[in-house]
Amino acid sequence: MSDSIIELKNISVHFQNGSESIDAVKNINLAIEKGEIFGIVGYSGAGKSSLVRLINLLHHPSSGDMMIGQTKTVKNGNVLIKGKELRNLRQKIGMIFQHFNLLDQSTVLGNVLFALKHSKMSKEKRLEKAKKLVEEVGLFDRIDNHPSQLSGGQKQRVAIARALANDPEILISDEATSALDPKTTKQILELLADLNKRTGLTIVLITHEMQVVKNIANRVAVMRDGEIIEKNSTYSIFADPQKPLTKEFIESASGNQEALEKILRQPEIARLQKNEFLIQLGFSGSSTDEPLISSLAKNYGVSANILYGNVETIENIPIGTLIVVLSGTATKLKQALDEIKKQNVKLEIIKEGK
């Protein structure tokens, strides 16, 4: 990838815990482009935090190569930089976490200034920069408040301002919204997306919540047991997931599975009659604009009872789901199902009446 800011080749991390051998990261190949928002999704223990701590060498790899920008940082598992060069690298990589790690006795401004204490700027310039950062994250009216006077979302905004103090090229967000309520999470993600758009900041999102990457990520990697099992554009991941775990994550973010489970508990679905099919249709892109259900009724004489529908937009492309009961004669139903299969629509037969 020609414009990669992070590139990992055959990277592994191996720990020895007494007699126990742990492979935290296994043979990872990953390139993250400059200026993109890249999501890494996985359950606890998947290895995503171990992977991301390699980027600023808080963890050392056991094998593989790594490039950060134009700097070769690891070759054949050996770290090539140390001392001042390593400190300079880490200054270019900001991090925010689930826990805000603010200085309780310092104000909002003081917390941001703390990140600039080793800067070569004059005191006046540091103060000017800190105030600008506080304003950028929308907290200028809280600049003299202490952390105890702030909400969780406001504390995370301070943490973001502090992480940006040394003009990083990369911002790593490690479960930074997992302790926040949905409304505050949305606001923090909007702030990160705005920073990315305005400054070109590369953002790496580590999360166990697919909803987080769905909202702002350009691309996604799914991890399990230290390995990346699937990676693609966010749209492609949601429109056509390949792995069962990826599908599980997507279902948790869409509400489709919950809706289907409720439908299956309905008495009329439990008593589905012969020549009735409960089906789920998946639409993406231009297929969401097609009047498929009405054309099936018109052209094949089947009736369609829509039980659930959902459309959301991923990367400005619509993705939709319908759960429908189709009924008609056996011949007409077969023709209708065959027609669906010819379209750019995913068909899953959930239940067939008897």
From Swiss-Prot:
Compartment annotation: Cell membrane
Keywords, ordered alphabetically: Amino-acid transport, ATP-binding, Cell membrane, Membrane, Nucleotide-binding, Translocase, Transport
Stretch forming the signal peptide: none
UniProt-listed PROSITE patterns: ABC_TRANSPORTER_1, ABC_TRANSPORTER_2, METN
Reaction catalyzed: L-methionine(out) + ATP + H2O = L-methionine(in) + ADP + phosphate + H(+); D-methionine(out) + ATP + H2O = D-methionine(in) + ADP + phosphate + H(+)
Topological relation to the membrane, as annotated: Peripheral membrane protein
InterPro entries noted in UniProt: AAA+_ATPase, ABC_transporter-like_ATP-bd, ABC_transporter-like_CS, ACT-like_dom_sf, MetN_ABC_transporter-like, NIL_domain, P-loop_NTPase
Domain ABC transporter positions: 6-250
GO cellular component: plasma membrane
Binding site for ATP: G42, Y43, S44, G45, A46, G47, K48, S49
UniProt GO MF annotations: ABC-type D-methionine transporter activity; ATP binding; ATP hydrolysis activity
Family: Belongs to the ABC transporter superfamily. Methionine importer (TC 3.A.1.24) family.
PANTHER family: AMINO ACID IMPORT ATP-BINDING PROTEIN, METHIONINE IMPORT ATP-BINDING PROTEIN METN
Subunit and interaction comment: The complex is composed of two ATP-binding proteins (MetN), two transmembrane proteins (MetI) and a solute-binding protein (MetQ).
Protein name per UniProt: Methionine import ATP-binding protein MetN 2
Gene name linked to the record: metN2
